[in-house]
């Protein structure tokens, strides 16, 4: 939800600018993570009545969302990048790789060609690939 604001600010200024978003799926209705609802069918609600601060887990952005965000931010010239509260090492790796860096954590990037069901590696059993198409 902050990308339109970052673009607007970037167009208005010429100095250095930072982007350090939270790694959670905020919305226009809930622009911060302090009052994000859990609409994922959770039947065991947090004792304090909201997801913040201890029940945000199902609201995380995934690696692909993070990469797309930081690729876009990098394109518009914002160079001081990072992730704020709740970031995982995977989120930080996506920031680095989105701007073309290879970091020590890059060696842990998924290798989908070796996935037991969705892989394209010659060792991937055909019956498992077929199962994945219908799973």
Q: Where does each model-flagged region fall?
A:
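Domain-level signal for soluble alpha/beta catalytic cores
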Residues: 1-135
């Amino acid at each position: 939800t902050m990308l339109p604001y970052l673009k607007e600010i970037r167009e208005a200024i010429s100095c250095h600018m930072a982007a350090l978003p939270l790694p959670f799926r905020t919305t226009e209705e809930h622009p911060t993570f302090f009052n994000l609802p859990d609409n994922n069918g959770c039947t065991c609600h947090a004792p304090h009545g909201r997801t913040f601060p201890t029940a945000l887990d199902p609201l995380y952005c995934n690696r692909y969302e993070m990469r797309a965000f930081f690729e876009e931010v990098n394109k518009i010239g914002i160079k001081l990048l990072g992730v704020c509260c709740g970031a995982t090492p995977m989120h930080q790796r996506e920031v680095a790789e989105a701007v073309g860096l290879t970091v020590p954590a890059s060696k842990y990037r998924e290798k989908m060609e070796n996935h037991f069901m969705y892989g394209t590696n010659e060792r991937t059993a055909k019956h498992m690939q077929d199962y994945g198409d219908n799973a």
